[in-house]
Amino acid sequence: MTHRTSPSPVALTASVNGVPVDLAVASHETLLEVLRDRLGFTGTKKGCDQGACGACTVLVDGKRVLSCLTLAAQCDGREVTTIEGLASGDKLHPLQAAFVRHDALQCGYCTPGQIMSALALLAEGRAGSDDEIREFMSGNLCRCGAYPNIVAAIREIAE
């Protein structure tokens, strides 16, 4: 009988929402698992766990990534931003406030991923037309169907 041994932990030194983090992570541990289970950032949601719904979207060095498909070890030396890193105390980030004003959330489950993707869209200057916004945001699913309101919130900030 052959015994399998677990691979040695991998050192992870990163910044999460501007705070330095030093952890030993398993080589198979996803960024989503580390954020939610080890660091307590539960705003990042686990939806499909297959990269199809966008609920787990976070920013790594300003680029959107699906944290359920990203190994935590890949984030060594990088800046990770979650939905919790946007507000300043009780003051919402302007995009968060626009989502509220435009009623761009219903159940709210997809909202953190929607907002993180929208931030990347805006940073990349991809908010040309409403069709372009919808295309960029197509990787983020909303079961409640708040898509027109999501586009309106993004459009407000883009202008």
Stretches found by the model and what they are:
Residues M1-E159:
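Signature of N-terminal electron-transfer/Fe-S-associated modules in redox systems
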